[in-house]
UniProtKB/Swiss-Prot annotation:
Source taxon at top rank: Bacteria
Role description: Catalyzes the conversion of glucosamine-6-phosphate to glucosamine-1-phosphate.
Cofactor: record remark: Binds 1 Mg(2+) ion per subunit.
Cofactor(s) annotated in UniProt: Mg(2+)
Entry GO terms, CC: cytosol
The encoding gene: glmM
Protein name: Phosphoglucosamine mutase
Amino acid sequence: MSRRYFGTDGVRGRANATLTADLALRVGMAAGLIFQRGEYRHRVVIGKDTRLSGYMIENALVAGFTSVGMDVLLLGPVPTPAVGMLTRSMRADLGVMISASHNPFDDNGIKLFGPDGFKLSDEVEREIEELIDEDIAKRLAKPAEIGRAKRLEGVHARYIEYAKRTLPRDQTFDGIRVVVDCANGAGYKVAPEALWELGADVVSIGVEPDGMNINRDVGSTSPAALSAKVREVRADIGIALDGDADRVIIVDEKGHVVDGDQLMAVVAESFKEDGRLARSGLVATVMSNLGLERHLAGEGISLARTAVGDRYVLERMRADGYNVGGEQSGHIILSDYSTTGDGLVAALQVLAVVARRGKPVSEVCHRFDPLPQILKNVRYASGRPLEDEKVKIVIADAERRLANHGRLLIRPSGTEPVIRVMGEGDDRDLVENVVDDVIDVLQKVAA
């Protein structure tokens, strides 16, 4: 059954257009009613990134939750994984993160976490959807039972200490020069501070949010600024987070980007060496490079694949007992520590491997040669371009041409009106030609 409000990562849309204060109010009321079960006082924690619209959505959510009798703890700008962690730590019934992750500032979103700190299941989200469009006014709290809202103090210190505890107590990064790019987003305070407390020589960029510059030419989706700064200050490593700090990419001392596939290999091999890699394998999506799978097989590590989306990676990890998973885009999930992707924690694990090896990042983190992979996007205004007959024909022809030489993956984004076309194979020219042929037809149909 199609869903009206929830996508693959919560409720998301353009601020004050599809994601309005009224919708946020109703999400708060509906979610509050679903999680208000029992006679005790109910509690929700709300965090956000640095988008201008976060103020509007935060206040609307507070009104929604308190109107149905839930108390609210406001965290302010914090990484998404901090919300999962604090939902559990504060024994809250529900956690909320206001963010559109790596999207531009004029988008925003509402991610919901259960009392266990994990994102809600599809089933619970469907329950909330059904309530959003109902007449909830009949179920509002009595005047004496309206909830209260307050700001929680010391949030950043709590999260920093949590992140540091994922390392051995004697682990330091003395003598390592780190450039950290916080995307002008949720990690702009905690990431530089955590690295400094661990002894690193820290140079920070993307730490001056103004409400509209989140992810703009900085962060994990725009690594050029980080690469340039690493070379400029002769740093040992660069770390780039995205807007809500749940994903990370690394830049080596030469300014070369290390993506999530390479980072998963680094962490999985380190965990295996220490005897703590569950099931001797990891979970990644269909987007991860075939080179990763081949490399891991040579290291005695299996790779299980899922649909695209960190929630599906995590579901597979929880169902089958894996403790390492992630996406090529930099969502790295280490379930021994976190209930979601955590850019800072993943970066600390990689830094620990670098410190232990005592070698340049270019040697430590480039674990395999990826197969040529071409990824292109087509934006569309409406309709279902993939159901067009001309598109079906060109896709079938592309799959035939790549049959014995690689693979083709075409999928609509779960968070925006975009179709992603990915081709991969041993012959780069063939892959590029195949992808371009599909893109040409899609663009004509989508126009």
